[in-house]
Amino acid sequence: MSKIVFCDFDGTITAVETFAGMLKEFAPDLSAQIMPQMYARTLTLRRGVRQLLESIPSQKYADILAYAESKPIRPGLAEFLAFLQEQSIPFIIISGGIQGMIETVLKREGLLDKVTAIYGVNLHTQGEYLQVHSDWENETELVAKALIMAKYSGVETIAIGDSVTDITMARRADLVFARDRLIDYLQAENQPYIPWDNFFEIREYLLLRD
């Protein structure tokens, strides 16, 4: 069966939680109030993330992209993407974070053209405050990862993630690579996963398995 890889961005491709860090930087008081509720899953991602982003003035958008510019990526991504290209395996980023931040980091690394597709949150900056736009919103998520995955049927799905935004993606995937908070969530639900720390490890696992 052919394969497809779905990968989170913040804290997964980046070595630090870029999106959460940005929210703490540009909306510190509201982040301190809302983010614990999202991690505890007492507030939906859709409502919490929208509220946080739409509290930030539009004039800060350039600063947000500059904030992302300096954030390091996790080791082995370039090699992993080269491996996937050799195997003709699509690599799709699905993120609850900002599309512009994702593209900024990938351009810096020279990897933007190695990615099959990117699904993230778009921001409108014409008004006084940022306005959130997502084509993949559902009742609980601004970017409904399982809904996007459902577009790609008849293939083995591989998910790579690290946190609360990746739970629905992990539930739907045939094979899950998890780290950080996502491990705790999956253990609580008795969901199988493979722990990982860098993309070299994922490449090695897939090589040995095949």
Curated annotation (Swiss-Prot):
Its EC number is 3.1.3.87. Gene3D superfamilies: 3.90.1470.20, HAD superfamily/HAD-like. GO terms for molecular function: 2-hydroxy-3-keto-5-methylthiopentenyl-1-phosphate phosphatase activity; L-phosphoserine phosphatase activity; magnesium ion binding. One of its GO terms (cellular component) is cytoplasm. It comes from the Bacteria. GO terms for biological process: L-methionine salvage from methylthioadenosine; L-serine biosynthetic process. Pathway: Amino-acid biosynthesis; L-methionine biosynthesis via salvage pathway; L-methionine from S-methyl-5-thio-alpha-D-ribose 1-phosphate: step 4/6. It catalyses: 2-hydroxy-5-methylsulfanyl-3-oxopent-1-enyl phosphate + H2O = 1,2-dihydroxy-5-(methylsulfanyl)pent-1-en-3-one + phosphate. It is an enzyme of class 3 (hydrolase). It holds the Pfam family HAD. Keywords: Amino-acid biosynthesis, Hydrolase, Methionine biosynthesis. The keyword Transcription does not apply. Belongs to the HAD-like hydrolase superfamily. MtnX family. Dephosphorylates 2-hydroxy-3-keto-5-methylthiopentenyl-1-phosphate (HK-MTPenyl-1-P) yielding 1,2-dihydroxy-3-keto-5-methylthiopentene (DHK-MTPene). NCBIfam families: HAD-SF-IB. PANTHER family: PHOSPHOSERINE PHOSPHATASE, POLYOL PHOSPHATE PHOSPHATASE PYP1. This is 2-hydroxy-3-keto-5-methylthiopentenyl-1-phosphate phosphatase. The lineage of its organism: Bacteria, Bacillati, Cyanobacteriota, Cyanophyceae, Oscillatoriophycideae.
